[in-house]
Swiss-Prot record:
Family: Belongs to the Ycf4 family.
Transmembrane segments: 24-44, 69-89
InterPro entries, A to Z: PSI_Ycf4_assembly (IPR003359)
A biological-process GO annotation: photosynthesis
Organism of derivation: Phaseolus vulgaris (Kidney bean)
Localization in the cell: Plastid, Chloroplast thylakoid membrane
Gene: ycf4
Classification lineage: Eukaryota, Viridiplantae, Streptophyta, Embryophyta, Tracheophyta
Function according to Swiss-Prot or TrEMBL: Seems to be required for the assembly of the photosystem I complex.
Name by which UniProt lists this protein: Photosystem I assembly protein Ycf4
Membrane topology: Multi-pass membrane protein
Length: 194
């Protein structure tokens, strides 16, 4: 996820895109793997060698191995197409708009196509109480226990409660988190709390 910032005296806009290199890489790997499984199943069904590097693929029976590979190949292609459409439609991307002129904060996110594609949350600036940095400890690792300290920037409001402004997936360093929180608190004229 990349965050682009545009700023003027009265408007601060964070543009958020959801397509990360890891998402593209995983969609590509799933597509290639499922396509390979489907080609092996077709090769088994036809009894022909569609792959130049191995003659053994066409020798195993279609039932049950080839049919199972066809099932997994088709399922993988559906998952891969779903991931590619999510990337193309930029689902989860959007804008965070802080507008002093209209005294509103808007959070706009893109959803799936349809009636409610744009998800909009509008908050009047007089409801914003503070910007908070909340640090947490997360345990990671399967075989080894690794503790990581992560900070998240929240906007505290009267009606909505705490609204997350950064996510763990943003991979922001502690100085970047502090800079973003300080910039927002200064721009909005609210206190910054730790």
């Amino acid at each position: 996820m990349s965050i682009l910032k545009k700023r003027s005296k009265e408007v601060l806009i964070y543009s958020i895109t959801e397509s990360k290199i890891s998402n593209i890489f995983s969609a590509l790997i799933i597509f290639l793997g499922s396509l390979g499984l489907l080609l092996v199943a077709i090769s088994s069904y036809l009894g022909m060698d569609l792959f130049l590097f191995s003659e053994e693929i066409s020798n195993f029976p279609f039932i049950p191995q080839g049919a199972t590979m066809a099932f997994y190949g088709i399922g993988g292609l559906f998952i891969s197409f779903y991931l590619w459409w999510i990337l193309l439609w930029n689902i989860g991307g959007g804008f965070d708009i802080f507008d002093k002129k209209n005294k509103k904060v808007c959070f706009i996110r893109w959803g799936f196509p349809g009636k409610n594609r744009r998800i909009i949350l509008k908050i009047p600036m007089n409801e914003i109480q503070s910007i908070r940095i909340i640090a947490g400890v997360q345990e990671r690792g399967i075989l080894t226990r690794t503790l990581t300290y992560e900070s998240i920037v929240y906007m505290e409001t009267i009606e909505q409660g705490f609204i997350t402004l950064t996510r763990i997936e943003d991979n922001l360093t502690p100085p970047e988190i502090a800079n973003k929180a300080g910039e927002l608190a200064f721009f909005l004229g609210v206190p910054l709390l730790y």
